[in-house]
Amino acid sequence: MAVSYNKLWKLLIDKKMSKVELRKATGISPNTMTKLNRDEEVTLTVLCKICSALSVDIGDIIEYIPTKDEEDLNEEKN
């Protein structure tokens, strides 16, 4: 499973908020911010903190990107 946080970064630009400001507003660790920068999975708690700080829904900050294997599996089911 792959995720992308591009929506989050675009939202920060729109809100004129830096990643450091987001980290401070949410209390998430620098290591967690690194995971977000690398499009790695983080906990639902972290995502909820971000949503709360930005007053948005989870779909506004994250996008699910199916892997090739997942796409193939879905095609087999259909």
Write out the residue ranges for each language-model feature.
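A short, Lys/Arg-rich alpha-helix, primarily the initiator
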Residues: 1-18
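Short, charged recognition helix plus adjacent turn
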Residues: 2, 62-78
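Residues within the helices of the helix-turn-helix
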Residues: 9, 20, 48, 59
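The alpha-helix within a helix-turn-helix
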Residues: 12, 23, 37, 51
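Short alpha-helical DNA-recognition segment
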Residues: 16-34
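Short, basic-rich loop-to-helix N-cap that marks the start of a DNA-contacting helix
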Residues: 40-52
